[in-house]
C-alpha cells in the first residue's frame, strides 16, 4: 500500500506533496497566478446616409439566429450597436463571418441602412466570462474557470512601496534596543568553532556592483552508445515539462512566482495563509474551495504525473495544523473524499508528524519555525498535549519583508526625514544596487519577496560573536528589458542581518509587516472586560442565540453537549428566580462563553472583593513582577477563579529579555500571570483551540478571515517557557521537555539559532530564579517577624516553657543550564523543512493506523459520526 498513498502537507510557505514511498516531497510554493482579462477591440460601422425602416419581425429573426450561435460568451451593449444588413453589398451572414467568433450581433429594430456607408473602427471593451471549469487532465493551455470573477483582487492594489510602506513606522528606540540586545547576547554566545579567515572584502558601490551575463540555451542531451548498453531497471524520476507563459493563463508554484513580475498581465495570490483558508480575498467560500481543489489536482497531475481519474485507487494522508478548526477539517475531508475522489483519508497533526519524521518518540518540545507562523507544542511519545499548543503570528515572511525594507532604504515620507536617514545608515551602511527604478518597482510582490528570501537564506546567521566575518552578498535577477540578460548584483552587509535575525524576539517590529495583529487581539478579547456590562445586559441573549444559530448539526467533529447542558441550567434557574433574570444571565453566560468554565457558582460579592485586591498587582512589565504576583495568586487560588473577566485587561507580557519598559498585550487569562517552570502549582490556561469547539470563537464583535484569535504576539523565548509551564506535571518532567527541544521548519536551518535561543531562554529562567530568591527572602523575613511577635506575647503573658515554631529551612536550588536541543541527534539525510511530510508518510504506511482511516463510503453514506472516533487527536 505504500505506493498507493499520497501525502499532502499544505503549509503557509509551500505545498509539499508526494507519494509515501518517496524520500523527498515535491515542494510547490503556495501561489496561484491567473492571467488578467484582456480588452478586445471590436469594429463598429457608422452610416452616413438616411436609413430606411425595417420590420421588427426581420430584426427579431436576425437576433435569434445570432444568439443561438453564441451562448453567453461575450457581453456587448445591444442599444449602442448597429449592424448593417445591406451595407456595401454585404448581408448579415457575411458580416457575421468577418467578425470575431465570440461576438454577438445585434440590430436596431427601427433603422436599416440602404446605401453606401463609410466605415470607421472604434474600440469597445468586452468582458470575457467563461462558464466551464478547467479539465485538469488535459494539457493546461487555457483556464475556463470563472474564479477570477470571485476573487476580490482582480485588479491588484497600487504598489506596496507607495501604499503600504508609507504606513510602516519602526521607532528608533526599538531598533536601538534590538542592537543592544545583539551586543549583550554576543557576550554569552560560545566561541566560534571554525577557523576565522581574515580577508579584505571588496567594497561595492554604484560603479562595480552590477554585472550581467548572457543566458545560454540548454542543449538537449544526446543518448550515447554506452548509455544505451547500461540500461538501469529503475525508471528516471519524472520531471515536468517547462511551460510557455504566452500560451497559458493558469499556473502555480514557481511558475506563478515567475509570472507575478508582469503585473500588467498576471496577478498572483495565496489560497491558504498561515496554514488556514484565506477567505479574505474571495467573494464566496465555494469559489475558494474550488480554487484549492483545482490547485491540488494540478499539482498531482503536473508534478506526480497522476491523472485525477486514477485518484480513486489512492489513499491520502493530510497533515493538519496543531490548532485545526473543526469546521475547516470537515471541509478538507469533503474536498479530499468527494472532489478528489480519494478512497480514504488519514489526518495527523504537524507536531506529531514532525517528531516521527526525525525518528523521535520521547518527550520533546516541538517548535516549527514556519513562513508565516511559529507553532509550539509538547509531544509525549506520539501524543500531543493540547494544553501546550501555542501559535505565534509571525515567521520567516516577516523577516524577509524587514530585510527588504532595510536594504532598499527606509521610508522617507515622514516629516522627520533626516532622522530616518540616520537610522537607515546606522543599520545598513553600504550601497545596495537592486532598488526601484523607472522600469520596475521593487515591492512586496511574490517575485521580489522570493528574491530577498533567497538573500536571507544565503546570508542570515546567528554567529554574532564572529566580528571578523564580512558578508558579501550576490544574487541574480533577470533583466526586465532584455530577456537574454541576467543581471548579477553584489553588495556588502553586516549589521542588517543581525537586526533582522534578532527581531524574531521583538514581535513589535514584525507586526509592521503583516501577520497576526495585536490590536485585533485586544478588540476580540475585550469581551472579557466586565466594565462593559451594559453591552452584555442588552446583547447577551443575542450573542448566545448567534452561537446556537451557527451550530452545524452535520459536523461530526464538533461536540456541543456542554452548550446544551448550559442552556438547560439557565432555563431552570430562570424559572426559579424571575426577578434577577438579568443578573443570572450576566454572571453565567459571560463566564461560560468567555471562559468556558462551569464552576462559577460563587456569589458576585466575593468575586468583586477579590477583584479590588488584584487590580493593582495585575499589570506589570517584567518577569520579576509576574513572579511577585504569583505568590499572592497561589495563596488566594480559591478566590481567584471568578476574577477572569475583571482582571483580564491588566495582564501584559514583556517584549524581550532586555526591554523592561515596552510591553506587548497578549491573550493570557488572569490566572496565567507567570510563565514559570519551577512553580508546579501555577497553571496557565491554553490559548489554543481545544478538542471541543469553544463558543469564544463564534462570539466576536469583528469577524476575521484568518482566525486571528488563535494567534498571539509574544517573544519566542517567552512563548516556549509559557508552553512548557502549561504542562500539568512536575518540575522534573518540565525540565525534560526543555532539555529536548526540536526545531523544525525553514527557520531551523539558520546557522547559530540554537545558541541564541538557548541564551534567550536562559535569561528568562535567570530572571525567574532571581524573583524566586527575592520571594523566599521576603517570606523568611515575615516568618522571623511573626516569630519575634509570638515570643514577645508569650513572655508578657506567661513564663512557661513553650515550643515556638521555627522558620522552614527549605531553600531554592540554584539554576542549572538544562536547556538542550534534539537537532544534534538527527540524521544528516533528514531535512528539517520536510519533517512534517516525512512523518506523515511514515504514519501512513504503518499497519497500526489502518483502523483510523476515514473511508469514502463512511463519509458519503451518512455515517459521519463514526469519523469522530477515528481521529487520532
Curated annotation (Swiss-Prot):
InterPro entries cross-referenced by the UniProt entry: Actin (IPR004000), ATPase_NBD (IPR043129)
Q: Which GO terms describe its cellular component?
A: cytoplasm; cytoskeleton; Ino80 complex
Q: Which residues bind ATP?
A: 368-371
Q: Name where it mostly resides.
A: nucleus
- GO terms of molecular function: ATP binding
Locate the compositionally biased regions of type Low complexity.
114-123, 596-650, 669-696
**Which Gene3D superfamilies does the entry link to?**
3.30.420.40
* Polar residues bias spans: 651-668
Q: Which UniProt keywords apply?
A: ATP-binding, Chromatin regulator, Coiled coil, Cytoplasm, Cytoskeleton, DNA damage, DNA recombination, DNA repair, Nucleotide-binding, Nucleus, Transcription, Transcription regulation
Which Pfam families is this protein grouped with?
Answer: Actin
Q: Which cysteine residues pair off into disulfide bonds?
A: none
- List every stretch annotated Disordered: 108-129, 596-701
What this protein is reported to do is described as: Plays an important role in the functional organization of mitotic chromosomes. Exhibits low basal ATPase activity, and unable to polymerize.
- Record's subunit section: Component of the chromatin remodeling INO80 complex. Exists as monomers and dimers, but the dimer is most probably the biologically relevant form required for stable interactions with histones that exploits the twofold symmetry of the nucleosome core.
What's the protein called, per UniProt? Answer: Actin-related protein 8
Native species: Dictyostelium discoideum
Amino acid at each position: 500500500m505504500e505506493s498507493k498513498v499520497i501525502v499532502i502537507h499544505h503549509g503557509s510557505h509551500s505545498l509539499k506533496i508526494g507519494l509515501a514511498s518517496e524520500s523527498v516531497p515535491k515542494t510547490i510554493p503556495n501561489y496561484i497566478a491567473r492571467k488578467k482579462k484582456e480588452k478586445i477591440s471590436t469594429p463598429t460601422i457608422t452610416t452616413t446616409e438616411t436609413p430606411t425602416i425595417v420590420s421588427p419581425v426581420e430584426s427579431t429573426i436576425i437576433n435569434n439566429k445570432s444568439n443561438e450561435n453564441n451562448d453567453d460568451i461575450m457581453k456587448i451593449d445591444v442599444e449602442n450597436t448597429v449592424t448593417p444588413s445591406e451595407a456595401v453589398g454585404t448581408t448579415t451572414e457575411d458580416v457575421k463571418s468577418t467578425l470575431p467568433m465570440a461576438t454577438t450581433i445585434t440590430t436596431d429594430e427601427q433603422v436599416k441602412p440602404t446605401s453606401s456607408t463609410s466605415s470607421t473602427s472604434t474600440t469597445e471593451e468586452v468582458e470575457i466570462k467563461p462558464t466551464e471549469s478547467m479539465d485538469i487532465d488535459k494539457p493546461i493551455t487555457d483556464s475556463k474557470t470563472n474564479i477570477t470573477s470571485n476573487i476580490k483582487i482582480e485588479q491588484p492594489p497600487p504598489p506596496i512601496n507607495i501604499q503600504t510602506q508609507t504606513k510602516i513606522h519602526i521607532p528608533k528606540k526599538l531598533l536601538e534596543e534590538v542592537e543592544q540586545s545583539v551586543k549583550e547576547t554576543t557576550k554569552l554566545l560560545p566561541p566560534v568553532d571554525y577557523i576565522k579567515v581574515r580577508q579584505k572584502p571588496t567594497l561595492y558601490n554604484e560603479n562595480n556592483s552590477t554585472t550581467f551575463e548572457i543566458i545560454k540555451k540548454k542543449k538537449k542531451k544526446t543518448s550515447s552508445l554506452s548509455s544505451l548498453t547500461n540500461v538501469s531497471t529503475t525508471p528516471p524520476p519524472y520531471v515536468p515539462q517547462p511551460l510557455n507563459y504566452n500560451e497559458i493563463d493558469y499556473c502555480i508554484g514557481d511558475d506563478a512566482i515567475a509570472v507575478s513580475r508582469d503585473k500588467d498581465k498576471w496577478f498572483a495570490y495565496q489560497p491558504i495563509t498561515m496554514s488556514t483558508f484565506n477567505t479574505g480575498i474571495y467573494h464566496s467560500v465555494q469559489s475558494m474551495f474550488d480554487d484549492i481543489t483545482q490547485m491540488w489536482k494540478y499539482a498531482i497531475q503536473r508534478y506526480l504525473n497522476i491523472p485525477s481519474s486514477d485518484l480513486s485507487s489512492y489513499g491520502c494522508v493530510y497533515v493538519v495544523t496543531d490548532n485545526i478548526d473543526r469546521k475547516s477539517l470537515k471541509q478538507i475531508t469533503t474536498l479530499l473524499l468527494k472532489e478528489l475522489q480519494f478512497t480514504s483519508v488519514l489526518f495527523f497533526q504537524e507536531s506529531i508528524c514532525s517528531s516521527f519524521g526525525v525518528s523521535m518518540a520521547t518527550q520533546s518540545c516541538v517548535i516549527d519555525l514556519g513562513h508565516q507562523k511559529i507553532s509550539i507544542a509538547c509531544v509525549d511519545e506520539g501524543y500531543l498535549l493540547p494544553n501546550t499548543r501555542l501559535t505565534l503570528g509571525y515567521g520567516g515572511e516577516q523577516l524577509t519583508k524587514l530585510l527588504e525594507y532595510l536594504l532598499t532604504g527606509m521610508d522617507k515620507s515622514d516629516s522627520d526625514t533626516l532622522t530616518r536617514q540616520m537610522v537607515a545608515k546606522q543599520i545598513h551602511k553600504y550601497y545596495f544596487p537592486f532598488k526601484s527604478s523607472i522600469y520596475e518597482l521593487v515591492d512586496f510582490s511574490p517575485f521580489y519577496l522570493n528574491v530577498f528570501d533567497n538573500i536571507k537564506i544565503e546570508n542570515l546567521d546567528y554567529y554574532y560573536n564572529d566580528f571578523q566575518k564580512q558578508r558579501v552578498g550576490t544574487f541574480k535577477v533577470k533583466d526586465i528589458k532584455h530577456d537574454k540578460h541576467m543581471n548579477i548584483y553584489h553588495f556588502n552587509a553586516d549589521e542588517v542581518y543581525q537586526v533582522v535575525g534578532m527581531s524574531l524576539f521583538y514581535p513589535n517590529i514584525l507586526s509592521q509587516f503583516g501577520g497576526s495583529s495585536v490590536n485585533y487581539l485586544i478588540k476580540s478579547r475585550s469581551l472579557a472586560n466586565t466594565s462593559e456590562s451594559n453591552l452584555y445586559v442588552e446583547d447577551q441573549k443575542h450573542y448566545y442565540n448567534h452561537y446556537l444559530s451557527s451550530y452545524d448539526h452535520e459536523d461530526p467533529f464538533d461536540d456541543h453537549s456542554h452548550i446544551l447542558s448550559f442552556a438547560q441550567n439557565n432555563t431552570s434557574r430562570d424559572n426559579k428566580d424571575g426577578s434577577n433574570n438579568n443578573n443570572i444571565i450576566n454572571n453565567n453566560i459571560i463566564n461560560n462563553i468567555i471562559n468556558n468554565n462551569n464552576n462559577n457558582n460563587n456569589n458576585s460579592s466575593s468575586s468583586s472583593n477579590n477583584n479590588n485586591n488584584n487590580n493593582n498587582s495585575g499589570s506589570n512589565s517584567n518577569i520579576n513582577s509576574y513572579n511577585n504576583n504569583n505568590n499572592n495568586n497561589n495563596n488566594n487560588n480559591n478566590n481567584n477563579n471568578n476574577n477572569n473577566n475583571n482582571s483580564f485587561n491588566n495582564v501584559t507580557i514583556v517584549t524581550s529579555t532586555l526591554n523592561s519598559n515596552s510591553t506587548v498585550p497578549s491573550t493570557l487569562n488572569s490566572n496565567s500571570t507567570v510563565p514559570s517552570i519551577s512553580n508546579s502549582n501555577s497553571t496557565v490556561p491554553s490559548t489554543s483551540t481545544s478538542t471541543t469547539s469553544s463558543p469564544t470563537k463564534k462570539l466576536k464583535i469583528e469577524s476575521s478571515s484568518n482566525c486571528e484569535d488563535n494567534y498571539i504576539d509574544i517573544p519566542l523565548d517567552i512563548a516556549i517557557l509559557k508552553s512548557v509551564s502549561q504542562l500539568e506535571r512536575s518540575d522534573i518532567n518540565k525540565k525534560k521537555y526543555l532539555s529536548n527541544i526540536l526545531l523544525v521548519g525553514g527557520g531551523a536551518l539558520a546557522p547559530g539559532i540554537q545558541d541564541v535561543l538557548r541564551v534567550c531562554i536562559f535569561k528568562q529562567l535567570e530572571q525567574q530564579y532571581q524573583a524566586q530568591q527575592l520571594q523566599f527572602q521576603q517570606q523568611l523575613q515575615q516568618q522571623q517577624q511573626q516569630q519575634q511577635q509570638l515570643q514577645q506575647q508569650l513572655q508578657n503573658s506567661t513564663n512557661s516553657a513553650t515550643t515556638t515554631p521555627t522558620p522552614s529551612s527549605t531553600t531554592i536550588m540554584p539554576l542549572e543550564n538544562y536547556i538542550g536541543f534534539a537537532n544534534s541527534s538527527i540524521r544528516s539525510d533528514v531535512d528539517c523543512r520536510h519533517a512534517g511530510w516525512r512523518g506523515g508518510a511514515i504514519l501512513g504506511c504503518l499497519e497500526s493506523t489502518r483502523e483510523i482511516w476515514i473511508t469514502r463510503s463512511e463519509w458519503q453514506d451518512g455515517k459521519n459520526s463514526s469519523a469522530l472516533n477515528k481521529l487520532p487527536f
